[in-house]
């Protein structure tokens, strides 16, 4: 069982050249590698949105990765809105959601 006091949930908005470059799948793969749960999806405005949840250190490592993204991506802005300490909706895995 995960220690919820060490868990963190962040909502990410990522802008730049992040669609059509494998960003979502690469984020999902990195999240799974780090043991982070949540979801990722494209936005109609050209950005990518994600909710990431897991041990604080793993979530922080994923945010560092997300600021770079995969090789073909060019991240110009990443906004992370913390929801640390709250575990309103625990995620079981990491999903790719339809665009919104």
Description of each model-found segment:
Residues 1-100:
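Intrinsically disordered, low-complexity, mixed-charge
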